[in-house]
Amino acid sequence: VGPMVGMNLDASHLMWMGGDPIAAVHKLGADRIYHVHAKDVRLERNYVGADGVLDTKTIDKFAKRTWNYVALGHGHDVRWWKEFLSVLSMEGYDGPISQEMEDLTMPALTGVKKSTDVLKEAMPCDYE
């Protein structure tokens, strides 16, 4: 990591593995984070307890997976996203935050709208 290579912090990847994206922001600091993906994860209770998180089923098998990518707010609530974005800001990150929509439980445009609404509410300052 340096001026030419930095981290694309995708919170969802840490989430499904049991990591803590907020702790990762504190550890990495803004000088190592070059881009942030806003993507959420939901652990599926009916399966994850018995099978764990190392699910090898493809994303299209979402009804039987132990975890799934979901629209923002459908895995972690707005309060969590407020804290995540606030910590990014406190650490000095002011770069892009991109939505990545992979929620197959709803139409893509619905998921984008729901995620956008969560991001707008969670942002530490007003963006239009």
Please describe what each predicted stretch is:
Residues V1-P3, E83-D94, C125-D126:
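A structural motif corresponding to the C-terminal end of an alpha-helix
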Residues V1-H74:
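Acidic/histidine-rich catalytic cores of soluble enzymes
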Residues M17, H76-W80, G111:
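Soluble or luminal CAZymes and related metallo-dependent hydrolases
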Residues A24, W80-F84, D103, K114-L119:
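A general structural detector for well-ordered alpha-helical segments in enzyme core domains, enriched
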